[in-house]
């Protein structure tokens, strides 16, 4: 089995992006699966194009895109991506779309094609904070997640999804007191646990992880 794992380059004035730094630190094999690691640009246009190119090039069985969610206390396994670009800040190319569809006449939304609840429990079982999330935002992370899920409609054997990671502890300088973060080694280990659960579980757990908000 081949697993394509992507992380973004730095954006928003940050010197690093813990998503790709952690991805680079992953082992080359997890649960018997080959791990293919790629960096993609934080760009609505180039980021989505590059991840589609990598899918076509690598022909993976599973795709996990990883992004930074500053302010998150742990990993967030994303359940849904929406067909909307509404950027609070410009991307790395200076683009700042407002209320634009990602795919003209595309589906309003796609659900992740991964065992998201099993992934949450797998990360938690290793002692790392993790929760199921019902919004990947409206920035480039959501754009990549939506684009990948739209693309793999033509590749029924490919399973795909998205995980957000918190700030790395090394990014906290200059940020407000109490801003949550994790050591990069812990982010990497938590990602590995999520991938292991995704590889080992073809169907998801049947347990309550809903929200009231």
Feature roles, as predicted:
Residues 70, 166-169:
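Glycine-rich beta-alpha junction loops
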Residues 171-174:
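A short acidic, helix-capping loop that chelates divalent metal ions and anchors anionic groups
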Residues 136-167:
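Active-site oxyanion/phosphate-handling segment shared across diverse enzymes
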Residues 1-136, 150-157, 177-213:
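N-terminal catalytic or cofactor-binding beta/alpha core of small enzyme domains
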């Amino acid at each position: 089995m081949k697993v394509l794992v992507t992380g973004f380059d730095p954006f928003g004035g940050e010197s690093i992006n813990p998503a790709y730094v952690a991805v680079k630190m992953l082992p080359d094999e997890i649960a018997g699966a080959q791990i293919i690691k790629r960096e993609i640009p934080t760009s609505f246009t180039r980021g989505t194009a590059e991840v589609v190119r990598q899918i076509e090039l690598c022909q993976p069985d599973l795709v996990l895109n990883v992004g930074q969610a500053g302010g998150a206390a742990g990993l967030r396994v994303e359940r849904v991506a929406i067909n909307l670009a509404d950027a609070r800040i410009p991307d790395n190319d200076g683009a700042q779309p407002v209320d634009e569809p990602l795919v003209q006449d595309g589906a309003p939304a796609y659900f992740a094609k991964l065992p998201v609840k099993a992934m949450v429990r797998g990360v938690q079982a290793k002692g790392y904070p993790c929760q199921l999330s019902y919004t990947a935002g409206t920035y480039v992370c959501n754009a990549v997640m939506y684009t990948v899920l739209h693309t793999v409609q033509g590749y029924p054997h490919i399973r795909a999804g998205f995980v957000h990671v918190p700030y790395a502890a090394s990014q906290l300088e200059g940020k407000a007191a109490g801003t949550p973060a994790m050591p990069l080694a812990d982010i990497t280990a938590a990602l590995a646990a999520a991938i292991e659960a995704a590889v080992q579980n073809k169907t998801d757990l049947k347990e309550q992880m809903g929200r009231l908000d």
